[in-house]
């Protein structure tokens, strides 16, 4: 994929989802070319399909919840978190290998050894089940409160490609938390003063009708925000925000 209008970019953040169906070949090829010509890029990745595969192998059923505002997310308890960290490592290793084959040094940054995102734990979640709102406890996910970019700049100085999983350090020092990958990418882009944030997914994009790909909204501006928000559903709400 060639981004004709991004030919002059010097610094950017790209996020690739962890869901099945993503083709990494073109991303790795173009990002490798850009890094080799001196551009500074950060790659943020998800881990959902890898988590699903590990869960099935261990006969564990993933638990998904929906917030009252319509956001769908995976519920992560302490056991799930260890499994999710392993799943992210599998994806990171795959990416490191793919970029290495093209002569690019991709370096994963994992907390607590390398802290980029810092988050506040959301121990209690409000979820909607059967039309009712209830509270569930034991959640090991969080929302990002700050972002440290020293390690990323250090890797850029070495001509490397930093790779970030959707994991953050607990602001109270209690270990690692799962965070939303899209919001991780957005926080990183803001902290690094990136010229562009690109979020790649296995779906076409924002659709006026989720069942009709011909209704894809190819381009818009902030002036159309209210209209765009009306079209967003499920996880697309988070990507827009």
Task: Identify the function of each model-found stretch.
Residues 1-241:
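Nucleotide/pyrophosphate-binding catalytic subdomain
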């Amino acid at each position: 994929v060639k981004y004709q209008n991004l030919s002059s970019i010097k610094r950017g953040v790209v996020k690739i989802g962890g869901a099945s169906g993503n083709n990494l070949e073109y991303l790795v090829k173009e990002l490798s070319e850009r890094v080799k010509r001196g551009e500074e890029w950060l790659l943020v990745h998800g881990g959902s399909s890898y988590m699903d595969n590990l869960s099935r192998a261990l006969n564990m059923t993933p638990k998904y919840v929906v917030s009252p505002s319509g956001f769908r997310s995976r519920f992560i308890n302490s056991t799930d978190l260890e499994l999710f960290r392993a799943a992210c490592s599998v994806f990171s290793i795959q990416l490191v290998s793919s970029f290495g084959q093209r002569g690019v040094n991709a370096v994963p940054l994992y907390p607590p050894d390398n802290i980029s995102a810092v988050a506040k734990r959301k121990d209690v979640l409000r979820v909607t089940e059967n039309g009712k709102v209830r509270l569930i406890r034991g959640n090991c996910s969080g929302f990002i409160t700050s972002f440290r970019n020293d390690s990323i700049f250090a890797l850029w100085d070495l001509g490397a490609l930093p790779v970030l999983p959707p994991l953050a350090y607990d602001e109270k020092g209690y270990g690692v938390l799962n965070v939303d990958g899209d919001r991780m990418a957005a926080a990183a882009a803001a902290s690094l003063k990136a010229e562009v944030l690109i979020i790649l997914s296995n779906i076409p994009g924002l659709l006026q009708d989720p069942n009709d790909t011909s209704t894809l909204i190819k381009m818009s501006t902030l002036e159309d925000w209210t209209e765009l928000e009306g079209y967003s559903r499920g996880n697309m709400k988070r990507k827009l925000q």
